[in-house]
Amino acid sequence: MQQPISIQQPVVNNINNSPNNQANINNNTTNNTNNNNNNNNTTNNIANNNNSNNINNNNEINNSNINNNINNGINNDIDRGGEKKANKLIAKTTKKFNKDMTAYTSGKFFELWRNQVVRDKILGYVRIHNLHYDKRVFKCIDLNNCIDNGADLQQQHNCHRVHNHYHQDLGHNYFGKVSRGIVSLSDYKYYGYLRSVHLIGYEQHEEELIKTIKSLPVGVSTLELSGHLNKIIFKEGSLPTSITNLTISSPTKLGYKSIPSHLKTLKLNSTFNDPLLVQGRLEGQLGIVPLLPIDGAITSLDTGGKFNQPFEAGLLPSSLTELAFGNEYFRPIEVGSLPSGIKSLKLGQRFCLPIPIGSLPIGLTELQLGGTQQNPILTIGCLPPTLTKLTLDNHFNQPLVIGVIPSSLKTMIFGPRYNQPLPPSVFPDSLTHLEFHQNSSYIFPLKLGYNIPSNVSTLLLSFRSQERNVTLGTNSNIKKLRCGGDYLPSLSSDDSTIGAILNSFSSSSSRETFPRSVESLHLNIVNVLDKEINIPSNVTKLIITGNNLQHDGPDVFMVGKKGSKITHLKLRGYEKPICQEMFKNLVNLKSIQFIGAYNHQLGPNCFPPQSITNLEFDCLPSVIPIGSLPSTLKSLRVKSFCTPFLKNSLPSSLLILECAFVRSFIDSYEIVDEIFVEQQAQYAQQQLLQNEQALQAQKQLEIQQQVAQQRLQQLKQQKQQQQQQQDNEQQLDHSIENNDGSIQDDHEHELEEEQENEEEEEDTNNHQHPFLQEAINHNQQLQQKQQEKYLYSSNNSNNYNYNNNSNNNNNNNSNEEDDEEEDLIQPIISKEWLPPSIHTLIIRGEPTIQLPLPESLTNIHIESKNQSILHNIPLMEKISKLVRVFDYESDTNSIFKKSLAICNNINQNQNQNNNNYNNNNNNNNNNNNNKKKNVKK
């Protein structure tokens, strides 16, 4: 096999040739000058011209050789195939560029990058192997024991790491399939984009783990260690200098100078309880030294849940700005023990000791206390005057006295167990955010201007008790209000300051007190809806939640009144079928979201026809009929969908589609609905009937074909008999007339007869009987109709069909029946059922993909665990430019919002282009008119 062309050799030789050529030219120049003194000026000019021409020619040759060698090496190796060779070649070229950057000019990179073939190959392999991830997870395994501590390796090859950590994050004790792309962490050695690594190790792989940590790529700045590392001791130099964020999630031992001074963030495991003083060397002598680097760069430290060791002044780094103690910490805080630069401090649930005055840093801005009911821990003057946020979390239930809260406080948050009366003026006037836990048991009176400052703009209340007494005046500054249960504070309907009620009420009497200025309204309604809800006219966002939400009577539940400004509607637990009359008053409605399983068939024209652009379903078990979605829809999101799309069921205006293709409805939600079961049964019966009809039609067609073939054979036999009689008569006449004929003439006559027979057979094959041709056409029409009606059928052989289950060959009848049932709920992504204008497709699950796809499609977002697409090399080579991979841990809502933003930008750009086009036309018309006027003048 031909070896790849080296890059360095021609570079060195060509670069070294240029000075030699220049030296030779200079020598020739001096010789000519000494020999021809009379023609000194002329000779120098000629030599200089030759010198410059030779140097330029050599440089051009060198540049072309370098580029040709690079491109030929990459193209030849990629064309020969082999993922591993391509990765090595890319890594090699990257290393050469980094090492010999001084020898290259700034234009060499662009000369390589402008090679479209090379660039497309590089980007294709990057997407195929998911090399563009910011974070990777690797697990040490034993190749001799492919099953180690529950690590189920379904594909055994030379892979040393498992980076599919989906099950591990869910608390499972097994792992998924090993990826075929990256074989070890060493493959990332020359890649600078890898920033975060999660290593899962075991005690028996201590040496390998330490070696792996030391050989991490240069760009890695975040490292997380987990697994069984009880006996592993980290010593000086164990961590590379590039690590700035370290998380140790497993029990480990930290030795002298094991924490590097360049570390910025350190999070220890939940079982860490070692002293902060260790045995080490100080000024060349053995002694007790601090574990953490005092003069280091650590800014954030989390000691873990079990830490309960004393510390003195100087043991914590002076650079700390964030410090968090776990729930087991209950040591006293001495004055001066905490660094003065700390801005955020967290104390756990067991901390119940008094806080001495001056013990907290003078610059502290955020404080979180767990506390118990034993001893008072807050006294007057213990909190610094710079505090802006105070959280009394979980078990804290100590009374607050006047003067404890500093005058700088802006945010106050109470936990679920706080139930102490708040005296008047306990909070300063600077307070703007007051929040009680959603399950708070606070039962004492609250009054604006008494124990609630008048400057509060956000008030979040939630009560479990029935005794409530909250008074809010008409001149309040509250812009956001949340209440729980069936309770509404005393408000005036003319209050124009409240901008949002986040959680509200079920009784109709309390709805009369909604302020007119409310723009966002969240109704928490118990089971039954009234026929109409009195919603303020300025509300633009409406959320209605409840369990088994229904309405009384056969009348349609009306949302809002005429002239309503609602643009976004969210329904949770709505159990009635929706219809267009339900949204009759919502002329400005643009977005509808159904939370929970919607177990009804979507009817035709059930949504407003000219306003809806965004539609979301948590679960949609039924088939989407043709014409049920609004014609103006631009984005559709279905979190769980298990039935195939029908052709033309998606509107042509759709730009963004997000669908989570699940194998069954029960996989996503642990409920079985009778309506859904009936719909699935009806759907299966319809499919069986259609299959039976297709079989009957095929049998009839076969019978018709047999009859037609028999008729053709009869006609052919008759024609042959007639032809044979004519031949016999001709032979008889010929024998009488030519008795002296030769054998050669007879042989030629036989050859002519054979040719005539062959021509007759071809004529009969080309000109079939009309009845047979009609039967064949009828069969083709039946097959075409069946393919158009149900796109999940696998009879279409014209398209490329990439199915992850295509390799499973089952010989048993039971397995074939199971495969047929799986095909019923296996959707297909193809050009036939996607709208022609779609540009973004978000796939969750593993559907079947048929090529070609719509030409307007520019982005395909898939999950990192999608095996059917990422590991299908022929498919990825064709759609690699469209694929964008997102991790399962990421928030899909953010991806959906980004896609919506792209959609809006496209619309804005189109409008802007149209406006620019119109403006240009107007300018051209004006210019033409001016020219005509000038000509007339």
UniProtKB/Swiss-Prot annotation:
UniProt xrefs under InterPro entries: FNIP (IPR008615), STK_FNIP-Repeat (IPR051251)
Comp. bias (Low complexity): 13-60, 719-729, 794-814, 910-929
Region of interest: Disordered: 1-60, 719-767, 794-823, 910-937
Coiled-coil spans in chain: 677-769, 902-937
Record's compositionally biased regions (Polar residues): 1-12
Start and stop residues of the FNIP repeats: 307-350, 354-394, 396-439, 598-640
Pfam families in alphabetical order: FNIP
Entry annotated with the keyword Kinase: no
Highest taxon of source: Eukaryota
Record keywords, A-Z: Coiled coil, Repeat
Tagged with keyword Flavoprotein: no
Ranges of Acidic residues composition bias in the record: 751-763
Protein name: FNIP repeat-containing protein DDB_G0271996
